[in-house]
Amino acid sequence: MAKAPTRARKRVRKQVSDGIAHVHASFNNTIVTITDRQGNALSWATAGGSGFRGSRKSTPFAAQVAAERAGEIAKEYGVKNLEVMVKGPGPGRESSIRALNAAGFRITNITDVTPIPHNGCRPPKKRRV
């Protein structure tokens, strides 16, 4: 006997007004993740995933484009207010915050959550160019 066709249920997008933008700015790439208050990811974008490869991936403009792309998807969830958590020393720290502000989000506060070791692992050797 043939199985009755099951109807695919349309996934309901939850409406979130407040969110947290986690910006991870390393020397090589910038990752922007927008979550709800509980930490569940709503949208994310990277500089590499936005079409930048190689040394162009580690530029402030690439971080700006990544933040804009993550912001567009987050707007579909109804996010209006953002709290920004910035981690890392990379070049995309400031430009990603500016891009989120220009995208129409109201930034409530900015926090630097860069992990600082209490003399943990040995850091990488200094670059000689």
Curated annotation (Swiss-Prot):
InterPro entries for this protein: Ribosomal_uS11, Ribosomal_uS11_bac-type, Ribosomal_uS11_CS, Ribosomal_uS11_sf
* SUPFAM superfamilies registered for this protein in UniProt: Translational machinery components
| An example Gene Ontology molecular-function term | rRNA binding
Q: Which GO terms describe its biological process?
A: translation
Q: Name one GO cellular component term.
A: ribosome
Which keywords appear in this protein's UniProt record, sorted alphabetically?
A: Ribonucleoprotein, Ribosomal protein, RNA-binding, rRNA-binding
Source domain of life is: Bacteria
Classification via HAMAP family: Ribosomal_uS11
Q: How does it assemble?
A: Part of the 30S ribosomal subunit. Interacts with proteins S7 and S18. Binds to IF-3.
Similarity comment: Belongs to the universal ribosomal protein uS11 family.
* Record function comment: Located on the platform of the 30S subunit, it bridges several disparate RNA helices of the 16S rRNA. Forms part of the Shine-Dalgarno cleft in the 70S ribosome.
Tell me the protein's name: Small ribosomal subunit protein uS11
| Organism of derivation | Tolumonas auensis (strain DSM 9187 / NBRC 110442 / TA 4)
- Per UniProt, what is the name of the gene that codes for the protein in this document? rpsK
